[in-house]
Amino acid sequence: LVGVGTFDDGKGGTYQLPIGWNGNSNGFRSREEGGINQYDFNVAFNVEDRMYFGITLGVNDVDYTRSTYYTEDLYDGSHSGFYEMRNMYRTEGSGINLKLGAIFRPIEESPFRFGFAIHTPTWYSLTDVYSSEIYSELNYKYENEDDNKQFKANERTIDYAGEGVQDYRLVTPWKFNVSAGTTIGGMMALGAEYEYANFGSSRLYYNDGTPMDNQNEYTKSTLKGQHTLRVGMETRISSAFSVRAGYNYSTSAFKDGAYKSLNANDMRTDTEYTNDLARNTVTVGLGYRGKWFYTDLAYKYDVYKSDFYAFSDAALQATKVTNERHQLLLT
């Protein structure tokens, strides 16, 4: 629990240092709900069964809520105490984008094909609503130097920052995709694709269209291009059943030393942030195709590591987190 003090340097100037008590233990909890729902509207056609073209209009609906709780026990010699901080954050809005793609089968007698796709940025119009609450209890113990008596004092503080509302626009990066695939003997299908997006090129604007220059420079300095590789195969083991397997690898979109930036006059106090590292995803599945009925069963395993920080501090060591997700999907 610190503040910043201004001190005289003895030479007619001043300098600043953090002041306060040392935290000797802390805890953090976070709850997230919602996300982004996307609705796609597609048009596709082919030329002589050799060239295939498609366009997709994507409409995104955003409804995301996050609440966090941070607590820290404090100790400074004979003084002690604790504080608790709660943050509530919600984002609502909508976005729109286009996806353009083409697939070519260059040799008529061969099943080999290759393709490419371009995804435009998603143009979002968003509203953030946030609030915070802090509770602290500090116990002081000190001596009166005149009569050498000890005194104790207790201080309780409850502060609530009312709701803050921010309307703004977000433009996500372009995405570029190339792919290739073939079939072997009519029994096995193989495919691979590569995708690139430079998240450092994301842009924020005020609701009137004015660029947020400081935030955009910060985005450019902390985010980078992300590379994604996907490979997959499907084998027909009988006239009705097929087995599938796939692998997805994505590099981190965060540069080394990336941090969360809050302005000094910002009402938000959710200082924690997480830098996700490379992500690995493995999928296996079984499919059934009958005359009147079909179904697919898949198992998906997703794992990636993260560096978690309760707040931005050059001396603060990251908390290493391993994230794992197991999903069983039936369609």
PLM segments and residue spans:
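Outer-membrane beta-barrel porins/channels
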Residues: 1-331
